[in-house]
Amino acid sequence: MLIFFEGIDGVGKSTQIELLKSVYNKNYLITKEPGGTLLGEKLREILLESDFKISKTAELFLFLADRAEHFEKVLKFSDKKDIICDRSFVSGIAYALANEQNLDINDLINLNKIALGGKIPNAKFIFLKISKDNLRFRLENRGNFDKIEERGLEYLMKVQKNMSEIFKILKIDALEIDANGDINEIHKKIKEFVK
């Protein structure tokens, strides 16, 4: 089984992944994009943490390189091992669209399909959404921002809107959860969905 957690930075994906892992401590493989492979860790550093400045187009292709490597080394084995992944191609498309480069969504979908071995994976998607005010509060309390988060609140809210649209366009039946609520209530909904 393959489970993707989606949502912008600060919605609680990591918290919910840890809660799910603690309940089902069978051998789930927990992974993430970017950074779920050795190459991915290096790309994550360039994309999110380094002072290295790259163009938005180069950024898009580095995320795609990470996704292709992650698919080949990790995700394509989800028929043999249960995998929980923090982010998916949905994030890749949503963030790329928010960069205001006039990219075509169908081109982005096709590029991501190439990175994913030619098709969208059969998976369960959990989409955590948050209000602008709660996101502001959470990000302010966290304090430490990566290069993407530094683009600001409006940018992240635009990404969240893009994610909703991508799920509709691709007809992905994601479990959409209001991340403004109680952590334990959110966890209950996720647990029920994953069963």
UniProtKB/Swiss-Prot annotation:
Keywords: ATP-binding, Kinase, Nucleotide biosynthesis, Nucleotide-binding, Transferase
InterPro entries xrefs: P-loop_NTPase, Thymidylate_kin-like_dom, Thymidylate_kinase
EC number(s) from the headed UniProt entry: 2.7.4.9
KW ATP-binding (keyword) present: yes
Residue ranges the record marks as coiled coil: none
Gene Ontology biological process: dTDP biosynthetic process; dTTP biosynthetic process; dUDP biosynthetic process
Catalyses which reaction(s): dTMP + ATP = dTDP + ADP
Matches recorded under Pfam families: Thymidylate_kin
GO terms, molecular function: ATP binding; dTMP kinase activity
GO cellular component terms attached to this protein's record: cytosol
Annotated ATP binding sites: 7-14
First-level EC class: transferase
HAMAP family attached to this UniProt entry: Thymidylate_kinase
Function: Phosphorylation of dTMP to form dTDP in both de novo and salvage pathways of dTTP synthesis.
Family to which this protein belongs: Belongs to the thymidylate kinase family.
Entry-linked NCBIfam families: DTMP_kinase
Protein name per UniProt: Thymidylate kinase
